[in-house]
Amino acid sequence: MGRTLLLLSRPGCGLCREMHTVVERLRGEFSLELVERSIADDPALLERYAHEIPVLLLGETELARHRVAESDLRARLRALGVSEV
């Protein structure tokens, strides 16, 4: 089992689908689990991130917001010492 990424999203969010796709591609390179959580289900998250999604977190560390290039996320994961497969 790898490190867990949390993707904050909401239904119908095109940018969220794009970020999910990028993360899924990188799961083949890194030891990662992905949990996706809709801000629509949590009033506190909705208030905090209403216009900021998608947001990708590793623990308390924000890895990306709105858009992320696969190469940039790969570099961030390596810099944070996430194990490669």
Spans of features found by a protein language model:
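Non-catalytic, surface beta->alpha helical segment in thiol-disulfide oxidoreductase systems
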Residues: G59-E84
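Short glycine-biased active-site loop of nucleotidyltransferases that positions the nucleotide triphosphate
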Residues: L46-R48
